[in-house]
């Protein structure tokens, strides 16, 4: 019966683990709903500020901000968004694979790449695998604020302002639905012409309108473009947070289900071992009685 006892101990351990993963699944589901609410709440601001920036730029063609001018690409920057914690399936790995593909492409073109990492997993990745990490931020918590991101964003914007970067991208997970999250690479700077055209089309569809600018359009555009980049990075962070909780919920559900299957298999093995032990005891008793 020694083998049966060991199996029973294993079953008990797996059941305890199953309780933990089941609890983590429920916690992740609750956190995912809150993260989705934050993601949804941030979308109108990010969408509207882009629309306003595009409108001001179109209404004042005499002033072309450097954030809207294409340059010869010699160096690019990536703001890479990850989670602070693991147990989220392949969520972070998929982002890192996307960044690695991008970096490989640019290196083949003779272009240098700088990185700003948001989230402890991204910071650890670049420390372990190399890459010119110029800024990093982790420990944002479950409800990040724009102020928490300004430092890392400012480093990349300063490099762009000084001509050290010619393009700036943000890489994060896109929330498709609860079951699906996919890595996405978005160009932040220069502001893409296609995006400007889309925003202009949306403006025309909503009617003809204009603003009164104080103190002037140039000053306003200078400030709004910085806010635009910050809002896009913040949107990426809160969307990635929703993806993290969804991925963790699915991962913990799979772990709970797998634990259940393993328990079923072990209980079958346990019952067979117990049956074999009982059969052996009966055989020994019968054999002893026959000898007498």
From Swiss-Prot:
Give the membrane topology, semicolon-separated if more than one.
Answer: Peripheral membrane protein
- InterPro entries xref list: ATP_synth_F1_ATPase_gsu, ATP_synth_F1_gsu, ATP_synth_F1_gsu_CS
Q: What is its main location?
A: membrane
- Compartments where located: Cell inner membrane
Question: GO cellular-component terms in the record?
Answer: plasma membrane; proton-transporting ATP synthase complex
User: By its UniProt entry, which Gene3D superfamilies does this protein fall under?
Assistant: 3.40.1380.10, ATP synthase, gamma subunit, helix hairpin domain
A GO BP entry is: proton motive force-driven plasma membrane ATP synthesis
Q: Which UniProt keywords apply?
A: ATP synthesis, Cell inner membrane, Cell membrane, CF(1), Hydrogen ion transport, Ion transport, Membrane, Transport
Span-the-membrane segments of this chain are none
* Family annotation (CDD domains): F1-ATPase_gamma
Q: Name one GO molecular function term.
A: proton-transporting ATP synthase activity, rotational mechanism
Among NCBIfam families, the record links this protein to: ATPsyn_F1gamma (TIGR01146), PRK05621.1-1 (NF004144)
Subunit description: F-type ATPases have 2 components, CF(1) - the catalytic core - and CF(0) - the membrane proton channel. CF(1) has five subunits: alpha(3), beta(3), gamma(1), delta(1), epsilon(1). CF(0) has three main subunits: a, b and c.
Its biological purpose: Produces ATP from ADP in the presence of a proton gradient across the membrane. The gamma chain is believed to be important in regulating ATPase activity and the flow of protons through the CF(0) complex.
Similarity remark: Belongs to the ATPase gamma chain family.
The entry's protein name is ATP synthase gamma chain
Tell me the organism.
Chromohalobacter salexigens (strain ATCC BAA-138 / DSM 3043 / CIP 106854 / NCIMB 13768 / 1H11)
Q: Lineage of the source organism?
A: Bacteria, Pseudomonadati, Pseudomonadota, Gammaproteobacteria, Oceanospirillales
């Amino acid at each position: 019966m020694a083998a049966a006892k060991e199996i029973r101990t294993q079953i008990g351990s797996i059941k305890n683990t199953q309780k933990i993963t089941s609890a983590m699944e429920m916690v992740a589901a609750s956190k995912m709903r809150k993260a989705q609410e934050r993601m949804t709440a941030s979308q109108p601001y990010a969408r509207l500020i882009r629309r306003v920036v595009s409108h001001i730029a179109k209404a004042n063609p005499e002033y072309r901000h450097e954030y809207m001018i294409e340059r010869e690409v010699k160096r690019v920057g990536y703001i890479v968004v990850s989670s602070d914690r693991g147990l989220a399936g392949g969520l972070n790995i998929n982002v890192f694979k996307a960044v690695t593909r991008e970096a490989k492409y640019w290196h083949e073109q003779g272009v240098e790449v700088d990185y700003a990492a948001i989230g402890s997993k991204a910071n650890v990745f670049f420390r372990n695998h190399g890459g010119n990490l110029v800024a990093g931020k982790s420990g944002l918590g479950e409800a990040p604020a724009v102020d928490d991101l300004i430092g890392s964003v400012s480093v990349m914007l300063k490099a762009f302002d000084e001509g050290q970067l010619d393009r700036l991208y943000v890489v994060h997970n896109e929330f498709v639905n609860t079951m699906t999250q996919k890595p996405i690479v978005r160009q932040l700077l220069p502001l893409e012409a296609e995006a400007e055209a889309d925003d202009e089309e949306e403006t025309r569809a909503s009617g003809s309108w204009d603003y009164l600018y104080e103190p002037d359009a140039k000053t306003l555009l200078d400030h709004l473009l910085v806010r635009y980049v910050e809002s896009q990075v913040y949107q990426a962070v809160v969307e990635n947070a929703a993806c993290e909780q969804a991925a963790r919920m699915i991962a913990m559900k799979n772990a709970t289900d797998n634990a259940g299957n393993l328990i079923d298999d072990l209980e079958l093995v346990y019952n067979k071992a117990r049956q074999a032990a009982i059969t052996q005891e009966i055989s020994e008793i019968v054999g002893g009685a026959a000898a007498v």
